[in-house]
């Protein structure tokens, strides 16, 4: 009952422009629109993002129109339609193009809104509970929501060395050698696995740059939304 497609950007985002990587490395959204949404579509769990969607009027009227309880009304509306048993289809072909965010502050502001909205949906209309969704659909939606909570553990590990130097506080109480023996194999394995799975859609090194910069800004609003989603 719904059809979604890709909205492409023909200008570099702030990271691509400042680091000189435009058209040289995959854009931040390439993984989501290239693999994740395609995978969601396999389980009838793809959701529309922004303007690139066609929705039948009757199903939309049945759920009371576009969801306005959260700031990510597109994903929330998709969830409600899936709960009612309606199906979706995803076209992995760019149907529209526009400008990417032109400044770092605008880019961060956009990601803050996405992060806050997805956590709001998790709290107000949790896909793990309630009727209407298949098990695979629940997992697809939860995966999209939990992604934006990654800023919290990332901040903890980024500030752990500083906490030790200033306050002699241990995040993990163990000798450095033991930490290396347990952590390094995991980090190497995770990096190689991600690179293998993501392939041309995302490069691990540049992904870490995006995620590290954004973590400082999306962690506070997602934490607040978890506690008070309204």
Task: Specify the residue positions occupied by each region the protein language model found.
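Long helical/loop segments within the catalytic core of UDP-sugar-dependent glycosyltransferases
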Residues: 3, 7-71, 83, 104-145
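Membrane-embedded multi-pass helical conduit in multi-pass membrane proteins
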Residues: 147-229
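General secondary-structure propensity
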Residues: 68, 101, 196-199
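Active-site donor/metal-binding and catalytic loop motifs
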Residues: 92-106
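Intracellular alpha-helical coupling/juxtamembrane segments of multi-pass membrane proteins
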Residues: 100, 107-125, 205-222, 226
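Catalytic donor-sugar/metal-binding loop of nucleotide-sugar-dependent glycosyltransferases
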Residues: 69, 78-96, 184
